């Protein structure tokens, strides 16, 4: 694993790339909103994403309580220097998704825009991350190239054919992406800790497939 030294703190390069992808994803989302939505909605949607990201960051740092509570009890300052790793990231993603939909449903944003914005932002972040990882990381090149190409193709389609980004197409894309990610994770023989034969990341994609199948044709308010 590649590490970047920032003062006295050593940070994995992949986390820095993810942080950069999160903010670049917001810029891409803002461009999409300008292209497709009324100006009055722009700030409301962007603020919702900022709040969701902050909540996800708190979940990521706080996940150490669940993953290694003994370490936190013995050394509370470990929360400043350590995270829950990939498992913690999965918990953070789940937490931020729940927060996003919970807050969005209390707003005047339509279900369609909530779903489209969340989908576009997620795929933009994934695409940017895999592009940066392909260029700057040494491991899992195949995963980064394939996942990056797939997600960027979806983002480009959403930009130029936004009226065709329907609920069914969104969940179909999520299902295909989840199967693709699962296949790549099995091919690369991940060494992550297993929970009932799967890693936390693999279980996330299994859950995403199930949720997508449930909501694929569920009616929503326009």
Enumerate the predicted regions with their spans.
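Hydrophobic, membrane-interfacing alpha helices
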Residues: 1-222
